[in-house]
Amino acid sequence: MSLPQRVLGPWEVSAMGLGCMPLSAMSANRLEILNDPEGAVAVIHSALDSGVTLLDTADIYAPSWDAFGHNERLVGAALATWSGSAEAKDKVVIATKGGITRGPKESWGRSSHLDYLLRAVEASALRLGVDRIKLWQHHRLDPSMVFEDQFENVLALLERGLIERIGVSNYSAKQLRRAIQMGGTPDQGGVISVQNQFSPRYRNDADVMDVCEEFGIAYLPWSPLGGISRAEGIGTGEFGAFAEVGATLGVSAYATAIAWLIQTSPTVIPIPGATKVSSVRDSLTGLSIALTDEQVSLLNSSLPEDAPLDGELEEQPAFR
């Protein structure tokens, strides 16, 4: 199936990717997926069959600390067993992330030290079943290190040939600009993606999107429907306009939210998660509709004025 395409560095990928984190039961209300590994693979296969060519994962996505890398293994196995041709498989970009640590008794931390990042990237490649990772993204900054020191370590992964392209995650606009100064733009072999939180609920990333548009960097909103625990709220209460607009178009509130995200910026590539084949198909319908200016205006005006902000990021301007 042919889907609309968007630019991700040197590649053209589907305008919507698949967030694979929920398939590793990172949320307590998703534990049933662990008892159905074939069903989890079927979700990924359904996305690939539908033309999705971007799969998002991370080394920490796992049901517990001692299953570290669970999601990467799942994604790697799903791509390997997919019925698509070798050419089709080669077009799929697996984007993974590293830089967050997870240990015994669920002790979480950060490390951007070079020795840790080198081990993390090598382990991710092994779990994914690849010689070199297509897109590796720095998951979160290490608060114990100076920005420049840790980003130099990120660039070292690229220089050593362990990864093809780099991206960043949970960076502010100021930090993104510094990363571009140090590593270059997409056409210079530098930063090609930013993965930050953005959805109808979280809308405080206008300045980051501006930087992405300026330099041709893809913006991959994580939790584009508001997160695992809040996605069901899209279409109800303060977000009821998404259901109203969707009803006039014959699609769900979720599909309407995907369409809204797509029209927010030409750099946006939503990566909604799913644990059911039906959810993948529903979200993909958002790529087949074009919201009118009036509908976009209605949706924007209906959103609550106060949008929550990731407390880790610097204060940012509201949604444009």
Q: Model segments located where?
A:
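A short acidic, helix-capping loop that chelates divalent metal ions and anchors anionic groups
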Residues: 24-29, 61-65, 101-107, 228-231, ...
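Short, acidic/polar
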Residues: 33-47, 112-127, 176-177
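Beta/alpha (TIM)-barrel catalytic core signal, keyed to glycine-rich beta->alpha loops juxtaposed to Asp/Glu
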Residues: 141-320
